[in-house]
Amino acid sequence: MTISNGDVKSETCNNGSSEKKPFRIFVGYDPREDLAYQVCHHSITKRSSIPVEITPIIQSDLRKKGLYWRERGQLESTEFSFSRFLTPHLSDYQGWAMFVDCDFLYLADIKELTDLIDDKYAIMCVQHDYTPKETTKMDGAVQTVYPRKNWSSMVLYNCGHPKNKTLSPEIVNTQTGAFLHRFQWLEDEEIGSIPFVWNFLEGHNRVVEKDPTTQPKAVHYTRGGPWFDAWKDCEFADLWLNEMEEYNKENKKEADNAK
């Protein structure tokens, strides 16, 4: 990510390939979770065998561009609670793109996820049956409970699907949380299912011994990750911390080389 004078530039990683059009990934960005964003970004590009274009969804930038104007509600735990639904619009309603929260750590090649794409669906996501036990999360934010919770935290959008044109800036800024987070602009059969290992909820999902289909491909620190003091000892904290150390070393090396 490059931020200059408030403008955000997406970054493309093609791992040596320049032929295939990059797969677009929009990552929710919150200023208090900058490190989480950087580590998520690093975990994707490090393992991707296909070109990817990663863009942070930064609320202040969207406001400057006139794409986002709704007031923040008391129950919004992040700055991207609703701006995430601008993904099809930001993709010019063309092709497939992914939105993902910044509190993800990718452990597998994103190509494996794109191989699951089926054009008959308007969106695809992990369809969790999740009721959190905690009353707070992250740095003390209220933990809300609602149907289809966490479905919207990682979504593959078929941006060219006619139904997704419903997600105009006007709708994203005025519709209810229920309408957006429960995908009420779609019929149930228009929502494709993805294996839970691509949105493996820390503290909820479980790895079954000797069952490789339960090994996480993307860990979601939905309750709060090691970048928050209250969650330094959460499950899979070591994986995230190792990724952070690697990111920091590479970042320092790049900075030293630029001197």
Swiss-Prot record:
Residue ranges the record marks as coiled coil: 236-259
Cited InterPro entries: Nucleotide-diphossugar_trans
Keywords: Coiled coil, Cytoplasm, Fertilization, Germination, Transferase
GO biological process, one term: pollen tube growth
GO cellular component: cytosol
Keyword Transferase (UniProt): yes
Phenotype seen when the gene is deleted: Impaired pollen germination and pollen tube growth thus leading to disrupted male transmission.
UniProt tissue specificity: Mostly expressed in pollen grains and pollen tubes, and, at low levels, in seedlings, roots, stems, leaves, flowers and siliques.
Subcellular location: Cytoplasm, Cytosol
GO molecular function, one term: transferase activity
Keyword Transmembrane helix: no
Function of the molecule: Probable nucleotide-diphospho-sugar transferase required for pollen germination and tube growth.
UniProt xrefs under PANTHER family: EXPRESSED PROTEIN, PROTEIN CDI
Protein name: Protein CDI
Organism taxonomic ancestry: Eukaryota, Viridiplantae, Streptophyta, Embryophyta, Tracheophyta
